[in-house]
Amino acid sequence: MEEAAPCSEPAKTIKRIDRESVHRICSGQVVLSLGTAVKELVENSLDAGATNIDVRLKDHGAELIEVSDNGGGVEEENFEGLTLKHYTSKIQDFSDLIHVETFGFRGEALSSLCALSDVTISTCHKSAKVGTRLVFDHNGKITQKAPYPRQQGTTVSIQQLFHTLPVRHKEFQRNIKKEYAKMVQILQAYCIISKGVRINCTNQVGQGKKSPVVSTTGGPNLKENIGAVFGKKQLQSLIPFVQLPPNEAVCEEYGLKSTDLPEKLYSITGFISRCDHGVGRSTTDRQFFFINQRPCDPAKVVKLVNEVYHLYNKHQYPFIVLNICVDSECVDINVTPDKRQILLQEEKLLLAILKTSLIEMFGSDVNKLNVNQNLLDIVGNVKAPPGDAEKPWVEMSHHSETENPSSEGKRVMTLSRLRESFSLHQTESYFQSPKKVKQRHSSSKQLSLDTILSTVRTQKAVLSEDSESCHEMKSKMPVPRKYLRKVDDIDSGFCSTSESDAGYNTPEAGSCVISESVNNPIEEEFCSSEEQHQNEYLKTVGHSEKSLECDIQVLGTEHKLNRVNDCNNQTNLPQEATNSLPRVRRFKNEADDFKAGIHPKVENTRNYMPCVDVLVEVKKKTVPLEFSMKALAERVRKIVQQQQKCTETQNYRRFRAKISPGENKVAEDELRKEISKEMFAKMEIIGQFNLGFIIAKLNSDLFIIDQHATDEKYNFEMLQQHTVLQGQKLIAPQNLNLTAVNETVLIENLEIFRKNGFDFVINENAPVTQRVKLISLPTSKNWTFGPQDIDELIFMLSDCPGVMCRPSRVRQMFASRACRKSVMIGTALNVQEMKKLVTHMGEIEHPWNCPHGRPTMRHIASLDLIASE
């Protein structure tokens, strides 16, 4: 066996990374965002036993983050290890991790913050007479230490977060408002779960005044904290969570055996919004989950809660606060750097408890209706007593509970079962009365898809033999065009047609299809094809070479075309058509006569001039010209290669998705990849199909475009961009009870709210949650809007501040208007109107779907692939 050749470079030895580099690398993985930085500092204050925590931000946290508390403070002997990596007082070894009850235990937060920013800490322990101010370098070492007068507690100041990582710092500053909104969401969770702790957060932009972000009063329970953060109005829509053991059906769903379930493993408390429509929220911005009072993001729990809620209110999401208490030995919190992903031992049991409890809560007495009649049976018939046949089907009784609480004729049914009954009844009645579809005939100028596909398929294609006499073809009466019956193998480009599909009578066997390529030059040497005679004939009857809007009536309007018996035999055209044929035919006849030995006679000898060459002496200037046959051959070879390359590119199958609902996503991706906006203006309009679709051609690809869907999407986007909704003034200003952060978002995006028809009065001197009052609401005919649309708009602007956006109900209104004002299916369009619709597709952002989700455009065939086959 041969030895490997020695490497010219010396082998790189494995070495330990220096401590400073390790520190900077790992620190960037601990503190990931503004929210993480604030979270770590607030958790330190809570671990120190603080009852009063103040968070102060400058420029949304980009300039300064300062957290002050009245906790126990830091003893002087712990100053050195306060900001060193993996120095902590919470645990001593790994076994202590199982029983840890504090938020922090790794000793990484302050050390990482030192590596990413400039950290200053002032602290005063309860045993010290005076406080101390400490300044740290990026390695966590103390650079300055001085006495500092302050009360018991600790203040940590973070300046220029991420400035040691230039790329992240620039990205952080660019998205500071998004980071700020996420930070507030995290801080709200600690405000809710921290009982007896007053948390206050303010933000100062530039040299302006401080604006409150969130504030709590240190309430003794969850309910008071929720009211302090989100206002008393939010409390009115909440019901307490009532824990129930999982029933047999749910246990079977999760594969649990009721006999083997541990008892009292989980204790769940909290609140959730009622499932009545209008009580929930349009987004998931107010969902808080805690495990042992630690904020977390349990993905499966979140999914389950929303799914159960959607069974009763499918258009909204619940407000929910859930605290799940479980033995610390059954939990692993050391999973991710931010400790928000938590692993549980008996997770299926937790999900079963939650599902059973939520279903029972939403189906409880709060959401029951009293009805006088029996429920619908499964097929939608009413089961009523014999004597009640003439009574109303469902009779709501508002006084049933007070007037006759023990009535036997009344049944109690839940909202969910009532909705199910109604949906069954309505579904059945819907299918029993289908709508009648009105069919219309197209104008005589429109091309049928059969004509288009057959003319471009090949010049040797032959129509079916079944036909009627040419006498009917000569008729000047317009023939109604029928629709295509079937298109087979749309990917390969072949289609199956019949006489009924084509919409007109075809010639007998042997007749050839009129070629589309009438504007291509005809080769003189090969002109025996019947198609070329018909092309020349079409020219003589006055048809434009560029026009593709010829109907089959053309063949029978002014010049009569005799029946063709055999395509290989010479066609007997009328005399007027034969005379009008160019010199191609005459040349061919003379050649045949010459072969037969018949020479043409000279009719006029006086006009006959002999051809004699006469020598003429001309002075010529000779210019030498460089010529290389080799260079010419090389150039020809390159041109041939380039043409072959272009042909291969054209024959490449760029569109593979079928026209099927299951392949909509694939088809959209292909169109988005292959079609750019400027290509729509270059598309050639072939015609209209079925009074509802436009057939367009780009290079060698045929596309079918829904005329209604594409016009609807264009109108929708124009309404979205340019419509300013008119507002209706309120009689008296309405208090919105917004949170401090939502007030800030609204004030910063007032212009966007005004374009949506909302107007407010701002009182900067009013207390938090009372600064903004609504004075105008948008109204538009039958559409009305309210505070829930403001909440949705605030949520959207929290993620994309300053970007023009619309609430979902405004989008629905625009979609409805765009649909009504668009070109309808069944409307005949001329070429200019179709071209306008196709060109508009290149002027909008998302041309592939209408606002209601229908596709606007699909690829139907590639002509190159059809020709090659």
From Swiss-Prot:
One family name in Pfam for this protein: MutL_C
PANTHER family found in the cross-reference section: DNA MISMATCH REPAIR PROTEIN MLH, PMS, MUTL, MISMATCH REPAIR ENDONUCLEASE PMS2
Function: Component of the post-replicative DNA mismatch repair system (MMR). Involved in B cell growth by positively regulating B cell proliferation and controlling replication efficiency. Controls cell cycle to prevent re-replication and defects in DNA damage-induced G2 checkpoint. Doesn't seem to counteract or control the immunoglobulin gene conversion (Ig GC) and to contribute to guanine/uracil mismatch repair. Possesses an ATPase activity, but in the absence of gross structural changes, ATP hydrolysis may not be necessary for proficient mismatch repair.
Keyword rRNA processing: no
Family listed: Belongs to the DNA mismatch repair MutL/HexB family.
Keyword line: ATP-binding, DNA damage, Endonuclease, Hydrolase, Nuclease, Nucleotide-binding, Nucleus
EC number: 3.1.-.-
UniProt subcellular location: Nucleus
Catalytic activity as recorded in UniProt: ATP + H2O = ADP + phosphate + H(+)
Origin species: Gallus gallus (Chicken)
A Gene Ontology BP annotation from the UniProt entry: positive regulation of isotype switching to IgA isotypes
Matches recorded under NCBIfam families: mutl
Entry-linked SMART domains: DNA_mis_repair (SM01340), MutL_C (SM00853)
Sequence motif Nuclear localization signal, residues: 585-588
UniProt: ATP binding residues: N44, D69, E108, A109, L110
Record's GO cellular component terms: cytosol; MutLalpha complex; nucleoplasm
Protein name: Mismatch repair endonuclease PMS2
Top-level division of the source organism's lineage: Eukaryota
GO molecular function: ATP binding; ATP hydrolysis activity; ATP-dependent DNA damage sensor activity; endonuclease activity; MutSalpha complex binding; single base insertion or deletion binding; single-stranded DNA binding
